[in-house]
Swiss-Prot record:
UniProt-recorded Gene Ontology molecular function terms: nucleic acid binding
Protein name stated in the entry: UPF0102 protein Rru_A3692
Gene3D superfamilies according to UniProt: 3.40.1350.10
Disulphide-bonded residues: none
InterPro entries from the UniProt entry: Restrct_endonuc-II-like (IPR011335), tRNA_endonuc-like_dom_sf (IPR011856), UPF0102_YraN-like (IPR003509)
Source organism: Rhodospirillum rubrum (strain ATCC 11170 / ATH 1.1.1 / DSM 467 / LMG 4362 / NCIMB 8255 / S1)
Coiled coil, from the record: none
Family membership noted in the UniProt record: Belongs to the UPF0102 family.
Length: 125
């Protein structure tokens, strides 16, 4: 693994950990981190799956030098793969009665608090 890739991986894990703490401080319960539905299924990894009350959020974390660039980094193809991962999670762990699911994005930029963009997109589910 190249050095720049390792640094990116380390930065991504740090950003996810920061988001987990931010979510916990705001009343969320973390159900899973880096959830994968399995190799060869076409489903991507969901960075964080969190629950507050009857709401389950599938959260993609992006760390970039500028917040706007972080949002651009989530492509339509990536959204579809994350949605498939969410469907696989819900297949194993169904929503609570009258529960809801949504897709959120958390953006990490230098010298700023994490930004939690709620209901960032809708697909399937």
């Amino acid at each position: 693994m190249r050095r720049s890739r390792r640094q990116g991986e380390r930065r991504g894990r740090w950003a996810e950990s920061l988001c987990v703490w931010w979510l916990r401080l705001h009343g969320w319960r973390i159900l899973a981190r880096r959830f994968r539905s399995g190799r060869g299924t076409g489903a991507g990894e969901v960075d964080i799956i969190a629950r507050r009350g009857r709401l389950v959020a599938f959260i993609e974390v992006k760390a970039r030098a500028e917040a706007a660039r972080a949002l651009e980094a989530i492509t339509p193809r990536q959204r579809i793969r994350i949605t498939r991962g969410a469907e696989a999670f819900l297949g194993r762990f169904p929503l609570p009665e009258k529960g809801q699911a949504r897709f959120d994005v958390m953006v990490i930029a230098p010298w700023a608090w994490p930004r939690h963009l709620k209901d960032a997109w809708r697909l399937g589910l």
